[in-house]
Amino acid sequence: MIDLLIIAGPTAVGKTDISIKLAEKLNGEIISADSMQIYKYMDIGSAKITKDEMKGIPHHLIDVVEPHEEFNVSSFKALAEKSIKDIWNRGKLPIIAGGTGLYINSLIYNYDFTDADRDEKYREYLTKLAEDKGKEYVHSLLKDIDKESYEKLYPNDLKRVVRALEVYKITGKSISEYTKENEKKLYDIPYNVNYFILNMNREVLYERINKRVDIMMGKGLIEEVKKLESMGYTPDMQSMKGIGYKEVLFYLNGDISLDEAIYLIKKGSRNYAKRQLTWFRKDKRSIWIDKDKYRSEEEIVDKIIKMVKDK
């Protein structure tokens, strides 16, 4: 089984430095789990690690797609799994570092991103049937094939009724049976996972976020966005909707002032950190590291290494 070390946490908490120190001590390579750092040319706004900051540690899944290209959790999972195997086969430790919770979950839970359990034509047929004969009629179709769903769901909850009928058509099983089977498979992964979440005092974190935004502006975020625009990248692209990029675009378009743009970037980043922490708290497999309780990053690194070895 492959050992997999994960260092996650909210934006600006200091994941980069900790993960590099761990990679140095554990002979590891880092796989980025960041939904913005995958894009080329978007360096400042994504707080992308520089060559110097890498300190010679190989990094994967950074600068892998153009800003106009589609990239989703399924794309990440495929590339990350390939990198994990490659790193492990070369006798090194794969270290996942990042704050995109869904990306991380795609690796530590056995999510199926295929459409094997979907039938769009059947869904369309049932939706049309509900329009023609009524939602009650479609709901009644569950009675003989999935009594539990029939009794639990209301006719007005058409989306879930359709899903239950779809699952039965494809699998021959009730949706509750199907869900239980999938839950058993959820933990069937080829990794021995050590999952750590870095956290710190909320006010201190927010100060770090605000300071980071000021640093980004000083490094030339506005010029970076101008360059992206000149290359043909537009506001409707997923990449350009990222925090920092959309606000600067509003400013360049004359919709808001520069001060308003900076304020909105800081606010958006703080809110994002809050959402990240809420997401990570849901995962019972993770170990939380409160950075405020340690005197140095070296102490944190040593603590993580000890917990991994004692497991």
UniProtKB/Swiss-Prot annotation:
TM regions (residue ranges): none
Keywords (A to Z) from UniProt: ATP-binding, Magnesium, Nucleotide-binding, Transferase, tRNA processing
EC number: 2.5.1.75
Annotated site residues (Interaction with substrate tRNA) in this chain: T100, R123
A Pfam family: IPPT
Superkingdom of source: Bacteria
EC supergroup of this enzyme: transferase
GO term, biological process aspect, one: tRNA modification
InterPro entries registered for this protein in UniProt: Dimethylallyltransferase (IPR039657), IPT (IPR018022), P-loop_NTPase (IPR027417)
Binding-site residues for substrate, renumbered to this chain: T11, A12, V13, G14, K15, T16
Cofactor names: Mg(2+)
Reactions catalysed, as given in the entry: adenosine(37) in tRNA + dimethylallyl diphosphate = N(6)-dimethylallyladenosine(37) in tRNA + diphosphate
GO MF: ATP binding; tRNA dimethylallyltransferase activity
Quaternary organization: Monomer.
Family note: Belongs to the IPP transferase family.
Primary role: Catalyzes the transfer of a dimethylallyl group onto the adenine at position 37 in tRNAs that read codons beginning with uridine, leading to the formation of N6-(dimethylallyl)adenosine (i(6)A).
Protein name: tRNA dimethylallyltransferase
Species assigned in the record: Clostridium botulinum (strain Hall / ATCC 3502 / NCTC 13319 / Type A)
Gene: miaA
